[in-house]
């Protein structure tokens, strides 16, 4: 009898438990909601850098030859010797010329209307008087030193007769030969004057034409 009651109790307990299981509400299931879509940020417009136009290369300044350039001066050559030799011969035979004295030959002074090589003329004159038999010439070195004392270069003419006489006295000369080329530079005339240093007197003068070579 007791064993049957035990079975009945077990059966009743099983029924009770099954009822409880049937009445249990299911656990709430959280509904997975999709995440709200974020609105897409508007894209910032990419700034467009305007292209810099290519600047055409400017041509350099056009160089023109200087039209105002002066032409090189013409180099003239003269036959000084043909003009000087006859004049020197006459001077050595002039009255008042005493042999054995010292002669200062000044540089030929250019008084023409153009440019000429006065140094060449002076050298030719000194050569024409070399070994003349009457005068001893003041050396070119002595004359250059005397000119430097006046602030002149050896090639410079003394310019005036008074300066020439003053230099002649300083170097111990008794005579001075003053020469100049004058007139048209294309056909100059050569003038010579032989002066006595002591008095400044012109004891001989001559003039001759000079031809170009």
Curated annotation (Swiss-Prot):
Task: Cite the source lineage.
Answer: Bacteria, Pseudomonadati, Pseudomonadota, Gammaproteobacteria, Enterobacterales
Q: Where is the composition biased (Pro residues)?
A: 36-50
Subunit description: Interacts with PBP1b.
- What does the UniProt record say this protein does? Regulator of peptidoglycan synthesis that is essential for the function of penicillin-binding protein 1B (PBP1b).
Covalent lipid sites (S-diacylglycerol cysteine): 20
Name assigned to this protein: Penicillin-binding protein activator LpoB
What NCBIfam families is this protein classified in?
A: lp
- Where does the record say this protein resides? Cell outer membrane
What residue stretch is flagged as signal peptide?
A: 1-19
């Amino acid at each position: 009898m007791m064993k049957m009651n035990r079975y009945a109790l077990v059966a009743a307990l099983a029924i009770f438990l099954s009822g409880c299981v049937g009445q249990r509400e299911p656990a709430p299931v959280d509904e997975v909601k999709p995440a709200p879509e974020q609105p897409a940020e508007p894209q910032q417009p990419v700034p467009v850098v305007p292209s810099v136009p290519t600047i055409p290369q400017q041509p350099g300044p056009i160089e023109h030859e200087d039209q105002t350039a002066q032409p090189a001066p013409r180099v003239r050559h003269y036959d000084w010797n043909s003009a000087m030799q006859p004049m020197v011969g006459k001077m050595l035979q002039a009255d008042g010329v005493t042999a054995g004295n010292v002669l200062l030959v000044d540089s030929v002074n250019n008084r023409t209307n153009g440019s000429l090589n006065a140094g060449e003329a002076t050298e030719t004159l000194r050569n024409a008087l070399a070994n003349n038999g009457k005068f001893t010439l003041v050396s070119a070195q002595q004359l250059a030193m005397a000119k430097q004392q006046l602030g002149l270069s050896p090639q410079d003419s003394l310019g005036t007769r008074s300066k020439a006489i003053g230099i002649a006295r300083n170097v111990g000369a008794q005579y001075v030969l003053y020469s100049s080329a004058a007139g048209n530079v294309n056909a100059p005339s050569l003038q010579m004057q032989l002066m006595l240093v002591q008095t400044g007197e012109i004891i001989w003068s001559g003039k001759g034409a000079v031809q170009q070579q």
